[in-house]
């Protein structure tokens, strides 16, 4: 039984992480899941939240994802995220501004499409803010 597996976290824009991991914790839709080497194969949706990565001989790395898919094979784990941002790169001011704009658009909606788009942006901004708070707590 191996002690590490290969992990890839990619978004539509870029590869965020590609390398060895001892374990990860990911925000699956059915709740947080912990993945260790030789885990049973699995394919599941993930929701917005933080993926915690424990790599050999390194500090934990935290990566915000806004949803996507998690595929687990015995020696390879892949996360295909809609959006993925390293925890330290999350911008609280930008997320607060996006939340404010989305709420304003929803309040003054001109079409159902505009309202739905603003609602999705509000959910994304709220999830980012929750991730920022969670990461801040973990560091203190």
Curated annotation (Swiss-Prot):
UniProt superkingdom: Bacteria
Keyword annotations from UniProtKB, A to Z: ATP synthesis, Cell inner membrane, Cell membrane, CF(1), Hydrogen ion transport, Ion transport, Membrane, Transport
Gene3D superfamilies for the chain: ATP synthase delta/epsilon subunit, C-terminal domain (1.20.5.440), F0F1 ATP synthase delta/epsilon subunit, N-terminal (2.60.15.10)
Localisation: Cell inner membrane
HAMAP family: ATP_synth_epsil_bac
The protein's role, per its UniProt record: Produces ATP from ADP in the presence of a proton gradient across the membrane.
UniProt name for this protein: ATP synthase epsilon chain
The keyword Ion transport belongs to this UniProt entry's keyword annotation: yes
Organism: Nitrosomonas eutropha (strain DSM 101675 / C91 / Nm57)
Entry's family note: Belongs to the ATPase epsilon chain family.
Membrane topology term: Peripheral membrane protein
Pfam families from the UniProt entry: ATP-synt_DE (PF00401), ATP-synt_DE_N (PF02823)
Keyword Cell membrane: yes
């Amino acid at each position: 039984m191996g002690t590490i597996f290969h992990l890839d976290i990619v978004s539509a824009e870029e590869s965020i992480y590609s390398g060895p991991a001892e374990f990860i914790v990911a925000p699956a839709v059915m709740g947080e899941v912990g993945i260790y080497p030789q885990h049973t194969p699995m394919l599941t949706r993930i929701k917005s939240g933080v993926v915690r990565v424990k790599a050999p001989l390194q500090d934990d790395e935290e990566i915000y994802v806004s949803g996507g898919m998690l595929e687990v094979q015995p020696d390879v784990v892949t996360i295909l995220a809609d959006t993925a941002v390293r925890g330290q790169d999350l911008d609280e001011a930008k997320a607060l501004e996006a939340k404010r704009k989305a709420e304003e658009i929803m309040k003054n909606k001109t079409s159902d499409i505009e309202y739905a788009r603003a609602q999705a942006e509000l959910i994304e901004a709220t999830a980012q803010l929750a991730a920022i708070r969670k990461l801040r707590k973990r560091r203190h």
